Every structure is written in C-alpha cells, then in structure tokens.
Amino acid sequence: MIHYRKALIAILSFFMAIPHCWGQNGANSPFTRYRFGQLADQGLGVNKAMGGIGIGLRSNLQINVNNPASYTAVDSLSCLFEVGFTMQNANFSDGNTKLNVKNSSFDYLAMQFRLFRGMGMTLGFLPYSNVGYNFSSTEELPPLSDWDDPTSVIRSYSGNGGLHQAFIGVGYEILPKLSIGTNVSYLFGNFNHKVSANFSDANIYPLARTYYAEISDVKFDFGAQYSLPLSKKGLLTLGATYSLGQDLNAINSYISNQKLNGSVVISDSVTHINKAFQLPHTFGIGATYEYDERLTVGADVLLQKFSETRFFGKKGELADRLKCSVGAQYYPDPTSNNFFKQIKYRAGAYYSKPYVKVNGQEAAREFGVGAGLTLPISSKWGWMNQRSIISISGEWVKIDPQIKGVLTENYLRLSVGLTFNERWFIKQKVR
C-alpha cells in the first residue's frame, strides 16, 4: 500500500527547504571573475569520491542525478532522501604571494522514489555555477615622457552570485535492461562582475564597469542506460547523456563610467542585450563494470560546447569544456550484517579543460583526485533493511594556469552526504 500522505508531506517539505539553500555559495576564487563563474559539481554522494563518474552508474541505495535513466534502479519499497555539504580550504598563489581562504557550502538536496513499475522519479536542488571574489592589483604605468612621473593604477575586482537549478526527473525502463530518462530543471539566479581602476595621477579619471545578469529559464537533460551481463557475476552498464543547448531568458545590464570628484563625467550603459546568454549543447558517455556487487569501476567523458554559445551577446569568447573521469568502488560483503563489511570504499580522479578564455587563450587546466567511504547508519530495522548511510569524501583539486596573470589554485575539500532510506511501501501485518 502506497503511503500517499507520507509522500505528499515529504514533497511539500522538500520544496519548502529549497529557499533556505538559495543563499549558499561555495565560491571564493579569483577564477570565478570570468563568465558564469565556477561551474558546480553536479554529483551527489555516490559520485563525489569516484572522480565524478555517473553516466554509466546505477545504484538502488543512493541517488545518481548525472544520468536520469538511472532512476529506474530505485528499490520499489524505498524512498531516498539525500542532502550534502562541503567544507573547503583554498590556496591561491602567483609565485610571489600566497592567500588561504576557508569556506563551506550547501551542495545538494534530493529525493527519489518508485513512481510506477519500471519508473522512478527524482526531485532535486543543485547549484549550477558560483561567483565569489574580491581582490585588487597594483601596476606601475610607464611615463609618457621624460618629464612625467610614473603613474600607478590600482585595479579592483569583485563579484558575487550564482545560478541554481531545481529539477524534477523521471526514468523509465522501456525494455529489459534498457532505461531512458529526463530531467526538467528550473534554472535561476543572478550574478555581477565589477572592475574599477584608480590612478595616482589626478588628471586621469577613475574608471568603473559593472556587468549584471538575472537568469530565469527551463533546462532539459536526457539520458539512457543499457545493462549487459557479461558473466554470472559481471555486469557492464553503458550510458549516454545529452543536455539541450538553448538561449536563456535573462535581464542584464552593462554600465561603464568615469568619475571626477564623485560625479560621472563619461558614461556608457546598455540595459538589455537580446539573447545575451546561451547554455551549451552537452554530450556525455560513460561505462561501469560491476563484479559480484563488490567491485565497481567506471569512466565518463563529458563535452560542453561553450565555444558555440554567447555571453553578454558576444560569441566565440569561450572554449569547449572537456572533462574525463575515472572511479572505483569496493564493497566487502553486500550480504553481511557486519558493520565493517558494509563499509564501501571509493576512489577516483578527473581531468578537465575549463571553458574560460583570457585574452583569447584557454586559461587553465584542472586536475582532481579523491577518495572516500560510505558508512551504514544503525536503525531499529538493522543494517540490511534500512540501509541509511553517511558518505564522507576528500578531494584535492588543482587549477593550473596556462597563461600569465592567472593564479594557481589548490583546493582541499571535505564533503559529507546523508542518505535516508525510508521504507514507505511495505505492507504492514495486522494481528
């Protein structure tokens, strides 16, 4: 018997919790001054310690939003709730000076359950991108002539905001071992980038520029998975995903001005740019191999065609983003009630070519390695029946600049995710 009242209460509680997450921003990086900012990790607890893989991954104990076709793996008796947070320690360096910044952020909120036979549904809230920076630099300008004194300029950069997505997705098993799925997301948020220049020469007016955008639109993601038994204990799952590239509905503005004694003397502004922003066409392929439910290995490749998109009405200023990920999981004994044999061990790594260009050149390369484990949480039903878990993972990430003027960034991240496995659909015996 389906507990509709429980489902309704949970869904309402889920949507009531979303507004409290809007203000969370995990960015604190000079690299976010470019374009949409730092693209957020779309993975949940099952993905984070495995290099972010998920396109070919299926799990009935944790939610995998990287491929909506995986929603059909949910247990018919269960409803899953997941929430995750990350603590981050960041180090920035230009070769001469170093800066250390610590912060924390909300990562995700998701709920998954079986809707009908062969069909699973997921509701979720994820960040899409983060903007957060505030720094300045000083430069000495050469004199115009032998009679002039050198002029110094202080350039200040600041920005904040980000984009978020609340989504609903379904997966459907159209044939035995073949599933398809889709996520429909409401993408929303705002961000601004500000830059100013102040000169030591009073004859040069201070300059300030501000870019602002507020985005609100619908986003579509699609996926498919096919599971192929290779032996009695071996299972290969192939996956593919596609995200629709599209124009974004946005309110945007650009303001540039120069001031003298606090009064604007030169100003230029554009209050709305038609079709200013686009999402990229995104293609992903992945595969995982599972042996005896104990060992899982997998790999993903993701390509985002940012080079074909517009940002503030300009095209060709971004690069295609490529991400390659590998990951593995070891599960000592799925049938045991022993606590230590129920711990899952995970590890993974990835390489990414970011979408940002600086002065027409690709700005950086990104590398990451991580590891983690999943611990069962005790309950009155015991380990095997309830299967609520806590996922803990650590990750080291390096953003390595390819051009001068871009900082080297190193991150240490500790992520914690909680998965609550509620038994909603068990028929109770009446004695």
List where the protein language model places each region.
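Subset of outer-membrane beta-barrel
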Residues: Q24-R431
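Bacterial N-terminal signal peptides
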Residues: I9-A17
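Sequence-pattern detector for short linear motifs
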Residues: L8-I9, V416
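Hydrophobic alpha-helical membrane context
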Residues: A17-I18, C79
